[in-house]
Amino acid sequence: MIKEIINVVHGTFTQLRSLVMIFGHAFRKRDTLQYPEEPVYLPPRYRGRIVLTRDPDGEERCVACNLCAVACPVGCISLQKAETEDGRWYPEFFRINFSRCIFCGLCEEACPTTAIQLTPDFEMGEFKRQDLVYEKHDLLISGPGKNPDYNYYRVAGMAIAGKPKGAAQNEAEPINVKSLLP
């Protein structure tokens, strides 16, 4: 008889514990979001879609140095270098295959001109895999991105048309080495 009472008390306690657990989970913050209706929280350093930025003058920042393609562990970046009349390099074509990209950010770190930047955009779903291959015109944005005042050619020391050598930002005047001789 005592064993039956213990079984009834144990069964009742188990049922009450289950009810408390259910009510506790009912009022807890939900893990599942109704995605299109509710915006998804993204951390501040989230790495999403890759874009190509422009310098403050409105020109392409990319100098087609090919460092991003070399740094990419899956080889999803391909580009071809071309040169303007004034000696400035630019990519003739720039292609990223987002179906292979793992969004690691190594291309952004390797870029010396900060032309490649990763944005928090993640909605890139397509029905055909070929639509995930983005060309240069798909990747170029109109603004400078994260570094609005940085201009690679002014810092790098390349001669700017109409300006003498040494007139660029962070560039020293040319030194006459013959005047240093005794």
Curated annotation (Swiss-Prot):
<feature type="binding site">
    <location>
        <position position="101"/>
    </location>
    <ligand>
        <name>[4Fe-4S] cluster 2</name>
    </ligand>
</feature>
<keyword id="KW-0004">4Fe-4S</keyword>
<protein>
    <recommendedName>
        <fullName>NADH-quinone oxidoreductase subunit I</fullName>
        <ecNumber>7.1.1.-</ecNumber>
    </recommendedName>
</protein>
<dbReference type="GO" id="GO:0009060">
    <property type="term" value="P:aerobic respiration"/>
</dbReference>
<dbReference type="GO" id="GO:0050136">
    <property type="term" value="F:NADH:ubiquinone reductase (non-electrogenic) activity"/>
</dbReference>
<feature type="binding site">
    <location>
        <position position="107"/>
    </location>
    <ligand>
        <name>[4Fe-4S] cluster 2</name>
    </ligand>
</feature>
<keyword id="KW-0408">Iron</keyword>
<dbReference type="InterPro" id="IPR017900">
    <property type="entry name" value="4Fe4S_Fe_S_CS"/>
</dbReference>
<comment type="subunit">
    <text>NDH-1 is composed of 13 different subunits. Subunits NuoA, H, J, K, L, M, N constitute the membrane sector of the complex.</text>
</comment>
<keyword id="KW-0411">Iron-sulfur</keyword>
<keyword id="KW-0677">Repeat</keyword>
<feature type="binding site">
    <location>
        <position position="68"/>
    </location>
    <ligand>
        <name>[4Fe-4S] cluster 1</name>
    </ligand>
</feature>
<feature type="binding site">
    <location>
        <position position="104"/>
    </location>
    <ligand>
        <name>[4Fe-4S] cluster 2</name>
    </ligand>
</feature>
<comment type="function">
    <text>NDH-1 shuttles electrons from NADH, via FMN and iron-sulfur (Fe-S) centers, to quinones in the respiratory chain. The immediate electron acceptor for the enzyme in this species is believed to be ubiquinone. Couples the redox reaction to proton translocation (for every two electrons transferred, four hydrogen ions are translocated across the cytoplasmic membrane), and thus conserves the redox energy in a proton gradient.</text>
</comment>
<dbReference type="GO" id="GO:0048038">
    <property type="term" value="F:quinone binding"/>
</dbReference>
<dbReference type="GO" id="GO:0005506">
    <property type="term" value="F:iron ion binding"/>
</dbReference>
<keyword id="KW-0472">Membrane</keyword>
<keyword id="KW-1003">Cell membrane</keyword>
<dbReference type="Pfam" id="PF12838">
    <property type="entry name" value="Fer4_7"/>
</dbReference>
<feature type="binding site">
    <location>
        <position position="62"/>
    </location>
    <ligand>
        <name>[4Fe-4S] cluster 1</name>
    </ligand>
</feature>
<dbReference type="InterPro" id="IPR017896">
    <property type="entry name" value="4Fe4S_Fe-S-bd"/>
</dbReference>
<dbReference type="GO" id="GO:0005886">
    <property type="term" value="C:plasma membrane"/>
</dbReference>
<feature type="binding site">
    <location>
        <position position="72"/>
    </location>
    <ligand>
        <name>[4Fe-4S] cluster 2</name>
    </ligand>
</feature>
<feature type="binding site">
    <location>
        <position position="111"/>
    </location>
    <ligand>
        <name>[4Fe-4S] cluster 1</name>
    </ligand>
</feature>
<feature type="binding site">
    <location>
        <position position="65"/>
    </location>
    <ligand>
        <name>[4Fe-4S] cluster 1</name>
    </ligand>
</feature>
<dbReference type="GO" id="GO:0045271">
    <property type="term" value="C:respiratory chain complex I"/>
</dbReference>
<feature type="domain" description="4Fe-4S ferredoxin-type 2">
    <location>
        <begin position="92"/>
        <end position="121"/>
    </location>
</feature>
<keyword id="KW-0874">Quinone</keyword>
<keyword id="KW-0520">NAD</keyword>
<keyword id="KW-1278">Translocase</keyword>
<dbReference type="InterPro" id="IPR010226">
    <property type="entry name" value="NADH_quinone_OxRdtase_chainI"/>
</dbReference>
<dbReference type="GO" id="GO:0051539">
    <property type="term" value="F:4 iron, 4 sulfur cluster binding"/>
</dbReference>
<keyword id="KW-0479">Metal-binding</keyword>
<keyword id="KW-0997">Cell inner membrane</keyword>
<comment type="similarity">
    <text>Belongs to the complex I 23 kDa subunit family.</text>
</comment>
<keyword id="KW-0830">Ubiquinone</keyword>
<feature type="domain" description="4Fe-4S ferredoxin-type 1">
    <location>
        <begin position="52"/>
        <end position="82"/>
    </location>
</feature>
